[in-house]
Amino acid sequence: MFVMHTAELVIATLRTHEAELRQSGLRSLSLFGSVARGETETDSDIDLAAEFDPAARMDLLKLTALERRIAELLGSPVDLLPEPVEKRRLQDQINRDRLRAF
């Protein structure tokens, strides 16, 4: 199910749940992509860039579980990308669009 979101609503929701999300090892979480740019379509997912505490030892299972939890909180599909991103072009887009939640 896709729900139309504004950047302000996404960031406010993430900030409301910041303590819970930080317990998963998140150091910072930023919105980027179409929602951040205000170009949301009815089928837009929510693109998030995450920096993790190295002590959290994130693996694919933990990352997937966190992505699902954030999608549940936001009521929309989420694409959660750990930073730094290897593809320079994608990292440039993240940096250009970035709206920091925390």
Model-predicted segments: where are they?
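A short, structured beta-strand/loop element
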Residues: 42-48
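Catalytic core of pol beta-like nucleotidyltransferases
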Residues: 1-28, 36-42, 53-102
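A structural signal for short, well-ordered beta-strand segments
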Residues: 31, 48-50
